[in-house]
From Swiss-Prot:
This is tRNA dimethylallyltransferase. HAMAP family: IPP_trans. It comes from Blochmanniella pennsylvanica (strain BPEN). Monomer. Its cofactor is Mg(2+). Belongs to the IPP transferase family. Its EC number is 2.5.1.75. InterPro entries: Dimethylallyltransferase, IPT, P-loop_NTPase. PANTHER family: TRNA DIMETHYLALLYLTRANSFERASE (PTHR11088:SF60).
Length: 304
């Protein structure tokens, strides 16, 4: 696992070249979508031929996909990989997906768009501090774990309570399915945040050079992606800013600035998750070859 633009995909592909008996499972909430290749930095066809990735291109952009969906899909893929006497190698930056795998799946009510819309309206009217304070009053344990700026999870925690009458914390204690696997956890992180931010900026400009705008135009021309219910795919970093540009809300230069800033903010959130993550083996992404060596050594030592 690691922040965006840290070189996770390159490391995974290199490891696959060295150790054929690993199969890669993508842990990325953006890579699941078809027709969203450039803006998600999805591995290209040549890379996927060398190192196929599970759980890539499994949803249309109009479809929803939850952490619970990922849990079930990843569990199924890991079972199949192990039965083939290979080792599952999970790679990505969607920390909530990793957390779901490690902590287990507990049954939650389905989303309710009206409740979400009402909460978002109230947040715009009174401010997110008040919405977070409401969560503190209802479910202080969850509120303590959810940052004020993590609006999506604040909404979800309140939504769960208003639907079920039970808090997120209470539901976790009622029934919790945990996977039977033992995980070895690695974090691939550059030596400095400035270097990571430089990579992010360079990658965003490279995406524009190879056709990111045209990719989003094709999505923008789909009427089914303009409905209020479609939020997950179009809210992906980069796509949201390009969508605003195509909608005429911002100009091209603003789109670039906002896209880079949003990606940096994503990386910052990912690093915050990782700093709090227990039992991590930290690897320097400035030297991916050495990082790959370290993982290979551990796999051999653990007889994986």
């Amino acid at each position: 696992m690691g922040p965006t633009a840290s070189g996770k995909t390159s490391l995974a592909i290199d490891l696959k070249k060295r150790k054929e008996k690993i199969d890669i499972i993508s842990v990325d909430s953006a890579l699941i979508y078809r027709d969203m290749d450039i803006g998600t930095a999805k591995p290209v066809a040549e890379e996927l031929k060398l190192a196929p990735h599970k759980l890539i291109n499994i949803r249309d952009p109009v479809e929803c996909y939850s952490a619970a969906d990922f849990y079930r899909d990843a569990d199924n893929e890991m079972e199949n990989i192990i039965q083939s006497e290979h080792t599952p190698f999970l790679v990505g930056g969607t920390m909530l997906y990793f957390k779901t795998l490690l902590d287990g799946l507990f049954f939650l009510p389905a989303t309710n768009q009206k409740i979400r819309d009402d909460l978002e309206y109230e947040a715009k009217r009174t401010g997110w501090i008040n919405i977070h304070d409401l969560l503190k009053h209802i479910d202080p344990i969850s509120a303590n774990k959810i940052h004020l700026n993590d609006h999506k999870r604040i909404i979800r925690a309140l939504e769960i309570f208003f639907i079920s009458g039970k808090t997120w914390t209470e539901l976790k204690l009622i029934n919790n399915q945990k996977l039977k696997y033992r995980f070895h956890q690695f974090a691939v992180v550059p030596s400095s945040r400035d270097l990571l931010y430089k990579r992010i900026e360079e990658r965003f400009h490279r995406m524009l050079d190879i056709g990111f705008e045209d990719e989003v135009i094709k999505l923008f021309n789909r009427s089914d992606l303009h409905t209020k219910e479609v939020k997950s795919s179009i809210s992906c970093v980069g796509y949201r800013q390009m969508w605003e540009y195509l909608s005429g809300d911002i100009n091209y230069n603003q789109m670039i600035i906002k896209g880079i800033c949003a990606t940096r903010q994503l990386a910052k959130r990912q690093l915050t998750w990782l700093r709090r993550w227990p039992n991590l083996c930290w690897l320097n992404s400035d030297n991916l070859s050495a990082a790959t060596d370290s993982i290979s050594k551990i796999l051999i030592e653990k007889s994986i």
